[in-house]
Amino acid sequence: MSPQTETKASVGFKAGVKEYKLTYYTPDYEPHDHDILAAFRVTPQPGVPPEEAGAAVAAESSTGTWTTVWTDGLTSLDRYKGRCYHIEPVPGEENQFIAYVAYPLDLFEEGSVTNMFTSIVGNVFGFKALRALRLEDLRIPPAYTKTFQGPPHGIQVERDKLNKYGRPLLGCTIKPKLGLSAKNYGRAVYECLRGGLDFTKDDENVNSQPFMRWRDRFLFCAEALFKSQVETGEIKGHYLNATAGTCEEMIKRAVFARELGVPIVMHDYLTGGFTANTSLAHYCRDNGLLLHIHRAMHAVIDRQKNHGIHFRVLAKALRLSGGDHIHSGTVVGKLEGERDITLGFVDLLRDDFVEKDRSRGIYFTQPWVSLPGVIPVASGGIHVWHMPALTEIFGDDSVLQFGGGTLGHPWGNAPGAVANRVALEACVQARNEGRDLAREGNDIIRKAAKWSPELAAACEVWKEIKFEFQAMDTL
């Protein structure tokens, strides 16, 4: 055995197990502008020092393995290894730490969210030295961002396509989500759109089931939106869910939607996968289709605060992969969403440059260079009484999506749509007049209801509806 091999095998090892911190914990390292940076919430097993846990994350998500291998000598580990460069305790939590890891850009394939996630959130999440691990945030450097197309069109192009400015857009998910025939489904779409909504939506699990095949649904929905456009003089859209069992079938459905002349299609990006999503986003840009993204399955990944991936990371990944809309929570409805955290990743979706702000869960300053923005979609248990808060929280560049809050109107779908449109227009006008929506919101809705019987009926139906549960994810 050569002296060099003896040296390698005798430093930092005990009974064949490598101490990761000797190689991968580098507190003196200054991250480069072109590094991908990650903030992990680490919960080590009892007896494992935080430095060893952080170094283990850096190693197992980059070049490391549990023992030395002779092929280490054939490359430059110092160039390619991930580095845990800083560790800090999580305030108020016992035995939890934020470990900051820097990854050299050469570890990742250009333009591939799939490859980036395979490394950073791959096998390391099953590592025995950790009780739990959560990826809280990523810093994507401009050099890597520029390898992605991003959203097919972005916020401004969408507004120009729709010819709608100065207010949030209104949507509705058709219910019941499963069981309607294609013709009845199209009728529900028509009633909502003629009542004043901008969009209606396939639910995330509507694909091509025996009760309603995708081609029939596409045809009846296209008929509904074209008829409502003629009646209202406004451009309308329906999110036709192109998600399918194969990428080839998904693209076939998107092609048919384009041939029908509809403006937008939809994809379930987590269940469908990032590779499929990026492929569809490229098709949509090349063919003038907007792309609505649903985040079905996200809570499996992001709901537990000490294990998984925070949604702000999934939102960044979606902006890279491509989508013009994505569901983002409501803060006020039935689904999980704490206000400061939600607004943090809403800014990450829409803005060109977002400063580090730990009070909103943003661990890194994020420049997006020229990547278009994504419109956040607020949906889930919202109704007309929520309109002032939603208008204030999300602003104009958003979609406010009322499913039950439209279809549950006692007079039907079209009056439900009218109620939402009147409430929105009243809130936008009040905001433009300088009124405080947070303080005067209920009064604004009551006054608008005096000249809109549809809104008055909606206010009466949902006056007692609240979803008051403690948030799972808090700062």
Curated annotation (Swiss-Prot):
Primary location group: plastid
Modified residues (N6-carboxylysine): 201
Top-rank EC class of the record's enzyme: lyase
Keyword DNA repair carried by entry: no
GO BP terms in the entry: photorespiration; reductive pentose-phosphate cycle
Post-translational modification: The disulfide bond which can form in the large chain dimeric partners within the hexadecamer appears to be associated with oxidative stress and protein turnover.
Catalytic function, reaction form: 2 (2R)-3-phosphoglycerate + 2 H(+) = D-ribulose 1,5-bisphosphate + CO2 + H2O; D-ribulose 1,5-bisphosphate + O2 = 2-phosphoglycolate + (2R)-3-phosphoglycerate + 2 H(+)
UniProt-annotated location(s): Plastid, Chloroplast
Keyword GTP-binding listed: no
EC code(s) of this entry: 4.1.1.39
Entry's cofactor comment: Binds 1 Mg(2+) ion per subunit.
InterPro entries membership: RuBisCO, RuBisCo_large_chain_AS, RuBisCO_lsu_C, RuBisCO_lsu_C_sf, RuBisCO_lsu_fd_N, RuBisCO_lsu_N_sf, RuBisCO_lsuI
Residues that coordinate or bind Mg(2+): 201, 203-204
Positions of the catalytic residues: 175, 294
Propeptide residues per the UniProt entry: 1-2
Site (Transition state stabilizer): 334
UniProt cross-references to NCBIfam families, sorted A to Z: PRK04208.1 (NF003252)
Quaternary data: Heterohexadecamer of 8 large chains and 8 small chains; disulfide-linked. The disulfide link is formed within the large subunit homodimers.
Additional record remark: The basic functional RuBisCO is composed of a large chain homodimer in a 'head-to-tail' conformation. In form I RuBisCO this homodimer is arranged in a barrel-like tetramer with the small subunits forming a tetrameric 'cap' on each end of the 'barrel'.
Family stated for the protein in its record: Belongs to the RuBisCO large chain family. Type I subfamily.
Function: RuBisCO catalyzes two reactions: the carboxylation of D-ribulose 1,5-bisphosphate, the primary event in carbon dioxide fixation, as well as the oxidative fragmentation of the pentose substrate in the photorespiration process. Both reactions occur simultaneously and in competition at the same active site.
Protein name as catalogued: Ribulose bisphosphate carboxylase large chain
Lineage: Eukaryota, Viridiplantae, Streptophyta, Embryophyta, Tracheophyta
